Amino acid sequence: NTGKKTSGNPIFPGWYADPEGIVFGDEYWIYPTLSLLYGEDEEIYKADLERQTDAINPEYNLQTHMDAFSSKDLVNWTKHPRVLHIEDVPWVKYALWAPSIIQANGKYYLFFGGNDIQNNDQYGGIGVAVSDKPEGPFKDALGKPLISQIINGAQPIDQFVYRDDDGEHRL
């Protein structure tokens, strides 16, 4: 025992997946996918549960937003709720997930998967939203998916964006 305070496990309450960890300035940030209800009042999700979509899994109807978490010390975390919501991305109806974020040219770009398409007859794919701050709010940047087709048999989901050694951003 080092006597140092730790954040514990889990580091914040909730049921999250696909975390993207990044440092902006002197703050650590985590952008995860909201997976399932976990100790929250189901009443706040009632409308999402009752929505009719073509989701292959009804629980995808709950994935209507993304939260973010920030910390200066990796011990104490602040929740930034609903940094991105499907209301701000008109082409997404369900399954907003797998965030990846970069900072470029004074803006923050949050890439995400939307609608879990299973074939090219469905509409969805990889989107990008933009904000002036890492805590959002993020708004759809294109009005359509950046990548909307299944390519080489791969769904357009689970993207990762980074800045390469040459300074170029890659997806």
Identify the function of each model-found stretch.
Residues 1-171:
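Carbohydrate-active catalytic/glycan-binding domains of CAZyme proteins
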